[in-house]
Design a protein with these regions (language model features):
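Short glycine/acidic-enriched loop and turn motifs that connect beta-strands
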Residues: 6-9, 53-57, 103-106, 152-156, ...
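A short loop-to-beta-strand structural motif that recurs across blades of beta-propeller domains
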Residues: 12-13, 60-62, 106-109, 163-166
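Surface-exposed loop and turn segments in beta-propeller and other repeat-based domains
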Residues: 26-32, 73-82, 120-131, 174-193
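Blade-loop segments of beta-propeller domains
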Residues: 27-90
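Repeated scaffold domains used in trafficking and secretory/extracellular systems
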Residues: 33-44, 83-90, 130-138, 185-199
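Short coil/turn segments that connect the beta-strands within blades of beta-propeller domains
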Residues: 44-45, 94-95, 142-143, 203-205
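Asp-box/WD-like beta-propeller blade repeats and closely related beta-sheet repeat scaffolds
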Residues: 75-94, 100-108, 112-140
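Beta-propeller blade signature
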Residues: 160-173
Length: 213
């Protein structure tokens, strides 16, 4: 990535390397990706490229795979709403995946094979009085989708020291539980543009990064 002087925009690229040895590389085999987000690789072999987080590129989600020659092959495109600020993707299976739309307070379910929208899961009823709710990084465990919730005001700052998650049933795509912790003095459950900011260990215990002060 190359950041512009004001810090809110720039150019980012991704490319596939045949090994991890030192070398000299250029962008001749690279693809442009959205600035402010990172490509998301899944266990299925899919690599998703999100649009620019601040809305400076076409609002579309692209799915790629790598062929035997190490070239990127586009497998499909899903058009996203304007000002979505898409930030994270998890796959349930070959027929359902989820993308969190921070700017709209929505988690969108879509078919990763056909790249067609299935449903919108609106989480705006979970917002605090002083903030808007912004779904962030996600993880699936035992048929439930756990979504980190960033409650932020117009300055991207929290109003309360709450850790909050939404638990969604992946069969119905309905909200089952709003999980709130007010005792740890932390906030912002997960970092939205970091898919590794929520993870699960061998015992299926879920861990998440939060912000404190």
């Amino acid at each position: 990535s190359v950041t512009n002087p004001e810090g809110n925009s720039g150019a980012s690229y991704m490319q596939a390397l045949t090994d991890l040895l030192p070398g000299t590389y250029d962008n001749s085999n690279a693809l442009p990706v959205g600035f402010g987000t990172k490509p998301i690789a899944t266990a299925s072999g899919n690599v998703y490229v999100l649009p620019d987080y601040m809305g400076n590129t076409k609002p579309e989600l692209n799915r790629y795979q790598i062929d035997a020659a190490g070239k990127w092959i586009k497998k499909g495109t899903l058009l996203l709403p304007a000002n979505a600020a898409a930030c994270n993707i998890v796959e349930l299976n070959s027929e359902k995946a989820y993308v969190s739309l921070q700017g709209l307070g929505i988690v969108m379910a879509f078919n990763p094979t056909t790249m067609k929208k299935l449903a919108d899961i609106d989480l705006n009823d979970l917002k605090q009085t002083e903030t808007r709710v912004s779904p962030a990084a996600m993880i699936v465990r035992d048929g439930k989708l756990f979504v980190g919730l960033n409650q932020m005001n117009a300055q991207y700052m929290p109003a309360r020291n709450n850790i909050e998650l939404a638990m969604i049933d992946t069969k119905t795509d309905k909200l089952e539980k709003h999980i709130v912790n007010t005792t740890l003095g932390m906030c912002f459950a997960t970092r939205p543009i970091d898919p590794q900011s929520i993870f699960m260990d061998e015992q299926k215990d879920i861990y998440l990064n939060c912000i404190g002060s």
